[in-house]
């Protein structure tokens, strides 16, 4: 349990470092940095692995175009998707949550169209879809012992090209995937569920508390609403389950 807790803290730290590296690079992250972690896990992924590779590639291509804070904040969809598509969920929960997400993201895209927020509306939509596919792929990947360790060698060209932040992002993402895969095998506690809540929150929070980074109000409000929606949905579902048990 002590080792698992330590591993959880290290994984959270990797998410914070990854978010800060992306911000310090000002979006100058080559798509290769996002592809390397997907290639590392590809041999045991099957269709899910290919979907992960495609989604990570797409997300990587959008980084130079979008504001960094918006790109990082989009990962808050992970806990919401986990709750909405859990076994305890229902069709009404999926529909209501879908309407909330759609409304909030349309608000962001309208703000971008009005010139009040940097970035492009269609790229915002592309990022949202990429995160959804990444969540689906991560949810269908199974732990395995085979990995493409050769893919880590691709970090060397990033370093030689004087792109240390890109190399750091690739290492952090690979480390996060490896840690989550290892913790998935543990039966004592549902660490991956806790990580699903913690990693997106910690990564974005690291940007919020950094004095040199200005988080646009629309981005912060939407992030907070999505996180609140995920938490409230989870709370309501749990409450209903407890009432059913009591009956």
Predicted regions and their residues:
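Membrane-helix interface "capping/anchor" motifs
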Residues: 39-51, 64-70, 83-95, 136-147, ...
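Aromatic-anchored segments of alpha-helical transmembrane domains
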Residues: 54-64, 99-110, 152-161, 199-209
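Non-cytosolic membrane-interface motifs at loop->transmembrane helix junctions
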Residues: 57-58, 117-122, 218-222
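Transmembrane helix interruption/hinge and helix-loop junction motifs
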Residues: 21-27, 42-47, 62-70, 88, ...
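C-terminal transmembrane-bundle signature of multipass membrane proteins
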Residues: 161-247
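Membrane-proximal helix-loop-helix units in multi-pass membrane proteins
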Residues: 70-78, 86-157, 166
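Alpha-helical transmembrane segments and their membrane-interface exit regions
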Residues: 34-43, 58-62, 76-86, 102-105, ...
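N-terminal signal-anchor module of multipass membrane proteins
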Residues: 1-33
